[in-house]
Amino acid sequence: MSEYIEVKSPSNLKVIGKVKRMSKDEVRGEIEEAYKGFELISKLPLYKRTKILRKVSEILEREQERLARLLAIEAGKPIRDARVEVLRASRVFRQSAEEAAIVLEGKNYRVDAYEYPMNNENRIVISSREPIGVVTSILPFNFPINSFAHKVAPAIAVGNSVVVKPSISTPLSSIEMKKILVEAGLPDSAVRVVTGYSNEIGDEVITHPLVGLITFTGSTQTGLSIASKAVSLGKRIIMELGGSDPIIVLEDSNIDRAASIAVKARYEYAGQNCNAGKRIIVREEIADKFINAFREKAKMLKVGDPLDETTDVGPVINNESAKKLNDVIEDAKAKGGDIEVLSKGPETGYFFPLTLINNANLDMLALKTEVFGPIAPIVRVKSDEEAISVANSTEYGLQSAIFTNDLNRALKISRELKFGAVIINDSTRLRWDSLPFGGFKKSGIGREGVRDTMLEMTENKLIAITLV
């Protein structure tokens, strides 16, 4: 199959490149090549692997502007945000180099503390962490560079090779990242990038016998399907799945600050972040005041060309996404929601207006599903208990936020929230690249974060020595 797939910019629909539409046979060949890469990279001394990762970090800093412009054009991410993503990716490669020795150092166990088996006083037991082999990394469209870093850098650090399958919407960034790794000294076979449609090659990167672990970031439905196939074959998995993160605003909070943070948490990158503040839950006593502040701040956001330095919000990724968002709006209208358009973008491109749903309720798609776009449903509640109930009402549990000046109250509520993180007086968008990141319920399986990813990507082997 020698066809190619055109890559179009979501901001103007122009063709910006093309990638190979790989066949299953071609993907099998790439996986086999990656296994050869594993045999090379796993035998490299750790200092050589970390030297490569540090070099990648340096190149990313040097190439920040070029990569940021590619990211803005390909993913529709505003250029200022794109620069931050490239810089974060650089830091992830550096942190992976720094953390690797700590993760891989193993342990010495005092087995003489146990009566059974007999004669433990004559034994030494140690453990080592060993690479799994070939890791399949399936990337989302929304963070093609930083997600590449989070999945590839820890894998290489601990001695795995990687097959990267980028989103078909944003494959060019992965191809550039692969080039940078090779420039930094990584064997070409240690990272392979496969491109094509998921319904044609997706099963191959999951079920191939040489693949030992699949790490996926994307929708819950797709992720659970992948997990089911992988686990049935005895493969390891890391799943970073959907989210419908609530922002709870209590009556004693700083309303203006809460509104500013909520606007950015919901509308940044056109609402296409897994940990965007997708549901806003406000105490009835302050709802009108909060909504007025939210409305005015959202109206100040500029929706437009991602390459424009003054742009705050770009387009959604494709027409399918825009259609789904329209369905959410129509559903909200039919179920009693008051719809307000707060800011619009250009006519050309996949620009979706920044939208507010006032008087939202739990029957709406906007509250029941993960809405990947700039739609902000606001729910009024009369008590903290009701706020907790609304927050926990979905199948998702990625991150959450509480705004209040009462720390004791915030901590009590945080105990009841079923989420991987509870952020007090700040955005659901907060993420520390070295700390555990993942969710409860259907928001994920396992955790990302440099050290946690390394642990997930290695096997723990015990070695017992009996002294004779």
Tell where the protein language model's regions lie, with residue ranges:
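N-terminal alpha-helical segment of soluble enzymes
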Residues: S11-I79, V86, A100, E285, ...
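Residue-level signal for inorganic ion chemistry
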Residues: L13, R49, L71, G159, ...
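Short, small/polar residue-rich loop motifs at catalytic or cofactor-binding pockets
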Residues: M1-E3
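Short, well-ordered beta-strand elements within core beta-sheets of diverse protein domains
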Residues: V15-M22, G37-K43, T136-S137, I247-L250, ...
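Conserved C-terminal structural/oligomerization subdomain of aldehyde/semialdehyde dehydrogenase
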Residues: N12-K18, V211, I248, K302, ...
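ALDH superfamily catalytic-core signature
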Residues: L213, Q221-N361, I424
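Rossmann-like NAD(P) dinucleotide-binding subdomain of oxidoreductase/dehydrogenase enzymes
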Residues: Y109-R257, V381
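N-terminal Rossmann NAD(P)-binding subdomain characteristic of aldehyde/semialdehyde dehydrogenases
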Residues: L53-F148, L186, V191
